[in-house]
From Swiss-Prot:
Residues 91-237 are annotated as: Required for transcriptional activation. GO terms for cellular component: chromatin; cytoplasm; euchromatin; nuclear speck; nucleoplasm; nucleus; transcription regulator complex. A motif (Nuclear speckle targeting signal) lies at residues 171-185. Expressed in the brain. Expressed in the ganglion cell layer of the retina. Keywords: Activator, Apoptosis, Cytoplasm, Developmental protein, Differentiation, DNA-binding, Homeobox, Nucleus, Repressor, Transcription, Transcription regulation. GO terms for molecular function: DNA-binding transcription activator activity, RNA polymerase II-specific; DNA-binding transcription factor activity, RNA polymerase II-specific; DNA-binding transcription repressor activity, RNA polymerase II-specific; p53 binding; promoter-specific chromatin binding; RNA polymerase II cis-regulatory region sequence-specific DNA binding. The gene is POU4F2. Residues 345-404 bind DNA. The lineage of its organism: Eukaryota, Metazoa, Chordata, Craniata, Vertebrata. A motif (POU-IV box) lies at residues 110-119. This is POU domain, class 4, transcription factor 2. PROSITE patterns: HOMEOBOX_1, HOMEOBOX_2, POU_1, POU_2, POU_3. Residues 53-69 have a biased composition (Gly residues). The keyword Kinase does not apply. Residues 170-184 have a biased composition (Basic residues). It comes from Homo sapiens (Human).
Length: 409
């Protein structure tokens, strides 16, 4: 800054063709932060240059005084212009430090869906945050979300979420940020809770003091599970059962395993000598809750794999239980045949040879109604059973009656 001294008699001189740069008197008013300074606007310096030029035209002591007043007014004018510029810059919002704030909603939704694919609770410690540090409500849901790590399906690397805003990026929110920085994460809270609501029933159980305790539970592909499967899982965990008891196992749901079991069941049933209708009626004897007798067509459709997949899965454990009971009874019959042969053994048809038959006809011609002693003697002579001889004489009398009746007509 070039101006004459108050004690000198030289006129104020200004270089031709050069612009005047006024040094700010109070530099603190011209900067918004310790590391940045605001330049002085050209509009603030142009009145000062004209004033200084006028002051430099005078000579003598009066001219020196005029120059001094012009310099003072120039400084005050530039200070006023710089102050207004500083106030204008201070009123502007700080540039957002959230570099992901401008992303579209589709990218956020895709990031949320990717993070909620595989949810496995591995940490039992709570990360407590002060109320001003987090946009979420400090309730049980919040603590449960903090203890659930999300595994990315693309990278297969587990990253535990210590803050809910980590899904939108890996940066941290500080308490001096503006409220509009937290608005995307408040919208993210609702969508994330919607994705994680089935997992809360699996990975969190209420402790004795009312706090939510994260428990390790397997919940694969929660985003793609149907509501009935999730309800079955929730019911299983409510009763204290492991997760694999409340859902269908992969072995039961495999069509190849169902086909192999149906073929094995059919072969075992044929070997045991049991019909499909017998199997359907015997299911009621198993005393399984909610299971009664089934029709023969249902068993036939199971063996031919024409039932629906869900019905095949539901019917497999029932038929497997019946097959185990049937094979157990069959083994008992083999070990103790005397307990079962008397009632189940079918009597063979009696066949009498021709010589014995002619002798019986001769005895019948002499005495159609022999006494019991006579029947015993004939049986002993012909080497036949007494009951066989008695039945033959009875049948022969019925035959003679039919012949007489047909001859009389």
């Amino acid at each position: 800054m070039m101006m004459m001294s108050l004690n000198s008699k030289q006129a104020f001189s200004m270089p031709h063709g050069g612009s005047l740069h006024v040094e700010p008197k109070y530099s603190a008013l011209h900067s918004t932060s310790p590391g940045s300074s605001a330049p002085i606007a050209p509009s603030a310096s142009s009145p000062s240059s004209s004033s200084n030029a006028g002051g430099g035209g005078g000579g003598g002591g009066g001219g020196g005084g005029g120059g001094g007043r012009s310099s003072s007014s120039s400084s005050s004018g530039s200070s006023g212009g710089g102050g207004s510029e500083a106030m204008r810059r201070a009123c502007l919002p700080t540039p957002p430090s959230n570099i992901f704030g401008g992303l579209d909603e589709s990218l956020l939704a895709r990031a949320e869906a990717l993070a909620a694919v595989d949810i496995v609770s591995q940490s039992k410690s709570h990360h407590h945050h002060p109320p001003h540090h987090s946009p979420f409500k400090p309730d049980a849901t919040y603590h449960t979300m903090n203890t659930i790590p999300c595994t990315s399906a693309a990278s297969s690397s587990s990253v535990p979420i210590s803050h809910p805003s980590a899904l939108a990026g890996t940066h941290h929110h500080h308490h001096h940020h503006h409220h509009h920085h937290h608005q995307p994460h408040q919208a993210l809270e609702g969508e994330l809770l919607e994705h994680l609501s089935p997992g809360l029933a699996l990975g969190a159980m209420a402790g004795p003091d009312g706090a939510v305790v994260s428990t390790p539970a397997h919940a694969p592909h929660m985003a793609t599970m149907n509501p009935m499967h999730q309800a079955a899982l929730s019911m299983a965990h409510a009763h204290g059962l492991p997760s694999h008891m409340g859902c269908m196992s992969d072995v039961d749901a495999d069509p190849r395993d169902l086909e192999a079991f149906a073929e094995r069941f059919k072969q075992r049933r044929i070997k045991l000598g049991v019909t499909q209708a017998d199997v359907g009626s015997a299911l009621a004897n198993l005393k399984i809750p909610g299971v009664g007798s089934l029709s023969q067509s249902t068993i036939c459709r199971f063996e031919s794999l024409t039932l629906s997949h869900n019905n095949m899965i539901a019917l497999k454990p029932i038929l497997q239980a019946w097959l185990e009971e049937a094979e157990k009874s069959h083994r008992e019959k083999l070990t103790k045949p005397e307990l079962f042969n008397g009632a189940e053994k079918k009597r063979k048809r009696t066949s009498i040879a021709a010589p014995e038959k002619r002798s019986l006809e001769a005895y019948f011609a002499i005495q159609p109604r022999p006494s019991s002693e006579k029947i015993a003697a004939i049986a002993e002579k012909l080497d036949l059973k007494k009951n066989v001889v008695r039945v033959w004489f009875c049948n022969q009398r019925q035959k003679q009656k039919r012949m007489k009746y047909s001859a009389g007509i």
